[in-house]
């Protein structure tokens, strides 16, 4: 900001405060010391305005507000290029400096705790109740918006509290997913196999692989669906539908792990148009130590205490 505009803003601001002080005291000079029956000539629905001074507390509130404004402008930037003299902020307060200061204080306080758990394996951290509580708080802040407060997911977002893992449910895979994120793509097969192929494959997957009944009146050829599946789907999902963690291809034998729904119509929609999903990387936001705690919490969700203790 140029010197001219800085001075203009400062002069206008301070001049306004001075004018308000003058106005308050100038209008107070002619007031009577006590109450009076004299009215100001204003009447509204039978209510008349008397010529009495403001209550003292009201007057002092005006003064206090102006004094607060002056102190604020001394401590914080508000008068053009003036940076303020708030203690603890070299060169004046800014919201960035306040954020950096608070982060630094938090790192100083909690850093040793995170470092202690980072030196342990994810499996070991998952057995520590205090660490799991810390991980749960991190999960609530950073993960619950997609996966839900109970970590059971929703349509398009996987359940983290069951045994179905697209990218692997071991501690290393979970931590890698959180650190680096995951990008998955199910290609659209509608044009390649046609509408009949879509219906046949969907029926085969639901009935033969997942063992779910087909709706009454379903018009589909399971034999042809199996053939098309072997030609186009097995390369990712496996001949038996066991899935492939390296590609994030889900296990088709367990419908409870299908994040886009298991109805015949939803399966057809997935095969016909494909699906795209992305788990954002959290390393730049949380850092390795916090991700380590978070991974331990997620790891503990699908493991009962006995299973965790055996690791």
Curated annotation (Swiss-Prot):
Gene3D superfamilies: 6.10.280.130, Cytochrome c-like domain (1.10.760.10)
UniProt-annotated binding residues for heme c 1: 143, 146-147, 279
Domain Cytochrome c: residue ranges: 130-209, 220-302
Residues that span the membrane, as ranges: 4-24, 57-77
One Pfam family, short name: Cytochrome_CBB3
Record PROSITE patterns: CYTC (PS51007)
Functional description taken from the UniProt entry: C-type cytochrome. Part of the cbb3-type cytochrome c oxidase complex. CcoP subunit is required for transferring electrons from donor cytochrome c via its heme groups to CcoO subunit. From there, electrons are shuttled to the catalytic binuclear center of CcoN subunit where oxygen reduction takes place. The complex also functions as a proton pump.
Protein name as catalogued: Cbb3-type cytochrome c oxidase subunit CcoP
Native species: Stutzerimonas stutzeri (strain A1501)
High-level lineage: Bacteria, Pseudomonadati, Pseudomonadota, Gammaproteobacteria, Pseudomonadales
Name of the coding gene: ccoP
